[in-house]
A protein has these predicted regions:
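N-terminal "arm"/small-domain region of PLP-dependent enzymes with the aminotransferase-like
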Residues: 1-71, 76, 83, 244-247
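Residues in well-ordered beta-strands of folded domains
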Residues: 36, 223, 240
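Conserved core of the PLP fold type I
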Residues: 59, 64-200, 210-231, 237
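PLP-dependent aminotransferase class I/II
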Residues: 235-248
């Protein structure tokens, strides 16, 4: 009887062990207070509100709640998300411009799948989110690290790297960078958008932490600022998340 060895796709040669998953395994141990994983405090979950909303959805529209839906997401939800984003300054994002994904990680995977070919240059902050590195490398990206300081990515250096490498995209976490915690200044945010237009380069703005702040609100997102820089909106992919403020 002939035995066939299982042959995986070549792209899986780029897959590395997830450091984040290894860290999360520690959370199951008693007495652990983890500063490593981005878990929201479970005591803050609105369990009663989520239970009530789930029961109402099943009572009022059971077929719609349990049936297949549109790929881009449930339309009333996208309408609510459009209003939510408008309240945060991104006032002209129509529901039809939104896609609902299973976490922003799926959005990043879709961007990698649709935008990155093997060998493409992709600029990321140094350091940046580990899961994004793994995701983009899976699709064969050649990652280029852009230096940062307390005000986020250094835009002079970013321009130099864009001009030199002509990347397929630039991935940034402007608000409370992970793992740096850096906050991209308002001046640099505008400059990033100007660079996108100047070099016709896609900017991916990952914004899972924009609602988590004490005291003064952070600067507007790149998405909210984009109307001030003509031509930049079409070169911007914004990834938001409810995982930190509602529940994962």
């Amino acid at each position: 009887r002939h035995q066939h060895a299982m042959q995986f796709a070549d792209r899986l040669n780029n897959v590395e062990t997830s450091a984040i998953r290894e860290l999360f395994k520690l959370l199951g141990k008693p007495g652990i207070i983890s500063f490593a994983g981005g878990f929201p405090d479970s005591a803050m979950f609105d369990v009663d509100g989520i239970r009530e909303a789930s029961q109402r959805a099943l009572a009022e529209e059971p077929g719609g709640a349990l049936q297949y839906g549109a790929t881009e997401g449930y339309e009333p939800l996208r309408e609510q998300l459009s209003a939510f984003m408008a309240a945060k300054g991104a006032k002209d994002v129509a529901p039809g411009q939104l896609i609902v994904t299973t976490g922003s990680q799926q959005a990043l995977d879709l961007l990698g799948k649709t935008m990155i070919s093997p060998g493409d240059k992709v600029i990321v902050e140094g350091p940046t989110f580990l899961a994004t590195i793994q995701c983009f490398r899976l699709y064969g990206a050649d990652l280029v690290s852009a230096p940062i300081d307390g005000q986020g990515v250094k835009t002079d250096e970013l321009e130099r790297l864009i001009a030199e490498h002509r990347p397929k995209l630039v991935y940034l976490i402007p608000t409370f960078g992970n793992p740096s915690g850096a906050m991209l200044s308002l001046e640099r945010r505008r400059r990033v958008l100007e660079l996108a237009v100047k070099y016709q380069t896609l900017i991916v703005e990952d914004d899972p932490y924009g609602d988590l702040y004490f005291g003064e609100a952070p600067p507007p997102s790149l998405l909210a600022l984009s109307p001030q820089v003509p031509g930049s909106r079409d070169l911007l992919a914004h990834c938001g998340s409810l995982s930190k403020v509602l529940s994962p």
